[in-house]
């Protein structure tokens, strides 16, 4: 209702299970704005020529883990011992981005590492049978399997301190952004206001759980690490020269024209 009142139009919300579905809906002309689309599917779509633009960061959450085999005795303290070894990474995903950022933070030369492109489930198997020294994983089941034979090379706190995280974006069709910059700007402003009011209170968690069809404990646990960056923080940290959004996009195989992504304030 807040969006309807501020934008002066009826905003129709549609739920999608994946970022890929969001892309398909935008390309079909069914939706104009995708809120909380995964960065990886957005990048993949743009690489394939989809006329989409990233205009904001929806939510930031913990980066994917890279599990190193328990048999090797390698930790963040001696991570350089990974040099010369083989690592499983699902390329062109946020796990790939996390891998590269973690290795940089630990001063590991990835040019010396043999990287094999494996889906998380396959990477977990390779870690278990000793085919790889480390596997970078996403997905609960694969992470659980990898955790049975290995441990994350960096802890949650270490990743946070190093500024390594994953994030979803707000993306739009070029057509909508060009024809309706005012509506888009208002949408982002209303979103900012809602984010600033978020305190993860029991009432807020219950509402999200009800809307998402999830139970309260699961919702609370899943959202415990969520961060909703302010517009000011996004401009300073994500969309500035060499910002996180630019760095992430480059790591995923797409180089934005710096200083950053499309900016609604320039329209």
Task: Annotate each language-model stretch with its function.
Residues 1-9, 158-163, 231-245:
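Short, solvent-exposed loop/beta-turn-alpha elements that line the ligand-binding surface or hinge
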Residues 18-22, 41, 78, 95-98, ...:
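Stable alpha-helical elements in mature extracytoplasmic
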Residues 62, 83, 166-168, 252:
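Residues that flank catalytic or metal-binding motifs in active/ligand-binding sites
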Residues 122-211:
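Pocket-lining segment of extracytoplasmic ligand-binding domains
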Residues 1-109, 114-118, 126, 133-139, ...:
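Short, glycine-/small- and polar/acidic-enriched structural segments
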Residues 260-267:
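Long, low-complexity C-terminal extensions of enzymes
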Residues 27, 46-47, 80-83, 128, ...:
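Alpha-helix boundary recognition
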Residues 178-259:
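Secondary-structure end/capping motifs
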